[in-house]
Amino acid sequence: MMADRTISSPRGPGDFLDGQMLIAMPSMRDERFNRALVYICAHSAEGAMGIVVNQPATHIDFGDLLVQLDVVPATKRIQLPPRAELVKVLRGGPVETGRGFVLHSSDFFLENATLPIDNGICLTASLDILKAIAGGQGPESAVLALGYAGWAPGQLETEIQANGWLHCPADPELIFGESVDAKYDLALRKLGVHPGMLSTDAGHA
């Protein structure tokens, strides 16, 4: 589903949305995406795949996950490099919630494992990137998502036309920003939209 290609902004509403951010509208009927901000990693005629970037996984942090996956022994949990301690664990979406996906800056690349998306953002789903982060050799910026959001062919386009989503250009602050809870309103402000102005009648940007 994930095509190895990069599309640059700006895009028209009929174009594929790789590298764009989806902002859930009040008309979104799926409660799992209430106030969700989704980074689109791949979008084609075959469907779409994205990562929710503003829903923290409250049951586990990055260090504990590294121990669970045997990336580091429990005795090394408190000795992680400072950058590793900053990596947030997110609920990336309702599909394959037991699988991890790392969105990260483009200063780190694994051959045959890293997918460049757009504007210096990459996706890697490999234990090797977790080992690199734990060893202080990982990317400058990263978040780890458990699961992803997926759409069947034409499904995302239909949801956008039904005013389920706004879409806007993504930037590192929306993906890697420290305040996860503030990302949704920040994305709206980047579009010039006040959260209180949203209604079920709004269209896509």
From Swiss-Prot:
A Pfam family: DUF179
Disulfide feature: none
A GO-annotated cellular component: cytosol
Top-level taxon in the UniProt lineage: Bacteria
Xref: InterPro entries: AlgH-like
Family in the record: Belongs to the UPF0301 (AlgH) family.
PANTHER family: UNCHARACTERIZED PROTEIN YQGE, UPF0301 PROTEIN YQGE
Name recorded for this polypeptide: UPF0301 protein AZC_0488
Organism (species): Azorhizobium caulinodans (strain ATCC 43989 / DSM 5975 / JCM 20966 / LMG 6465 / NBRC 14845 / NCIMB 13405 / ORS 571)
